[in-house]
UniProtKB/Swiss-Prot annotation:
Protein name: Aspartate--tRNA(Asp/Asn) ligase
PROSITE patterns named among the record's database cross-references: AA_TRNA_LIGASE_II
One GO term of the biological process aspect: aspartyl-tRNA aminoacylation
Family to which this protein belongs: Belongs to the class-II aminoacyl-tRNA synthetase family. Type 1 subfamily.
Amino acid sequence: MKYRTHRCNELTSNHIGENVQLAGWVHRYRNHGGVVFIDLRDRFGITQIVCREDEQPELHQRLDAVRSEWVLSVRGKVCPRLAGMENPNLATGHIEVEVASFEVLSKSQNLPFSIADDHINVNEELRLEYRYLDMRRGDIIEKLLCRHQVMLACRNFMDAQGFTEIVTPVLGKSTPEGARDYLVPSRIYPGKFYALPQSPQLFKQLLMVGGLDRYFQIATCFRDEDLRADRQPEFAQIDIEMSFGDTQDLLPIIEQLVATLFATQGIEIPLPLAKMTYQEAKDSYGTDKPDLRFDLKLKDCRDYAKRSSFSIFLDQLAHGGTIKGFCVPGGATMSRKQLDGYTEFVKRYGAMGLVWIKNQEGKVASNIAKFMDEEVFHELFAYFDAKDQDILLLIAAPESVANQSLDHLRRLIAKERELYSDNQYNFVWITDFPLFSLEDGKIVAEHHPFTAPLEEDIPLLETDPLAVRSSSYDLVLNGYEIASGSQRIHNPDLQSQIFTILKISPESIQEKFGFFIKALSFGTPPHLGIALGLDRLVMVLTAAESIREVIAFPKTQKASDLMMNAPSEIMSSQLKELSIKVAF
């Protein structure tokens, strides 16, 4: 059976007089004095269908029984709309189809929320429960189409660059040094488990050992971790690895890839992209994920703070803390209520308070005015290049607290004062991360244990491992990390040394990574790679508030699927087959 000759966005004045067939959902229904109007909708657009009672009474009576979201196949003739009745907002707004016959393909129950009135705010949990209906509202499908265009462009680009797409296993071995694994019990081997991949990291490195040279994959990955607006338990990444290269070879390819992906949405990205070291990012922006759409750069104020009598400044200086802040142009107009609000805001991130200093026609107004000489205030204004009506905002705290507090504060103020537009795209490579960091007093890998140290820092592995920098690189866009990668360790002895520093016992190394260490010992080429977060990339491209909006069937913030009611209990017979007993 033929359901349509045209899509619902295709008919124009050029088709007037033609007999056509359309299929779609009843978007809106109106009966105006014996004339039935139906907006018929498919994924591509809307066409107005009309039936007049005085011309076709039986057809009119049948059509009058149709309701929202019923699925119809309609035959009829394309006619011009009456003068003054055109709709310039529709591609089909100058025509309508006079119904000759129609067939109801499917009926719909009463809807849990309106499809046609997509401006109405609907509870997100209800939208996720009825995700297939939420898709019909149009916005979700537009985002999924963007995702498709990005994936298609990625595959074409990577193929042209000589990369081979390889699908790596989903059932693998648990190596829980990173986030928690999702585990899959084995029926054939009772008491043993597979793990779903947090990334194809080991497999893609083994492909380099195997001589593939250049690999990529749009990989689905799984991490059992607490969720945020930009995290899901399962997510997609553009996974890339190449042999016989370094960052000078790989990073330009990634920049061209990013420019190609953004071009699918008509966005031009100037190349090359900016670069800054991890330490520069921390010093100037308080974070390794700086949003460069606006300035508000942080500056170290310790040399000025020590010339004050402010006890909080002096206490932080005595205990190895810092005093830093930024200048807000025109911010001297901020009220005391606003400044008190910012003070409470930074306390959420561990700061004890907020120092403010206003430059008002050359005069100083500050909540620490009595603790610092006028001359020092004016030197601070010159240091920050603060003009009349600017304000300085400073925090005294341990370095990590000051950085985190000021990072969040500068983002908040930039948003409130509209210092950037949503169609700005500011990329930056962050390089030279620490190889290790401290977590609860324990040395852990900053990225993952397969990241190579910078060659000049290798001697520090034995004397000061926390000072070792890594040959790693993150790509940050508007404050979001959208890609992360590194040069890999290809020397088995160096890899074993890294595991030892991480306090992974020889027995544990052999159990979890013995196969990998063995592979490295059979002649491994120098190699490096990167993974781009596909969900985050599309989220930015579509200005979505969450990656849930760019995934067809996402989980909630609590990692549940409200539509399928997953996770769910399973039958006792299934548990028995898997030799599993559930205890709470």
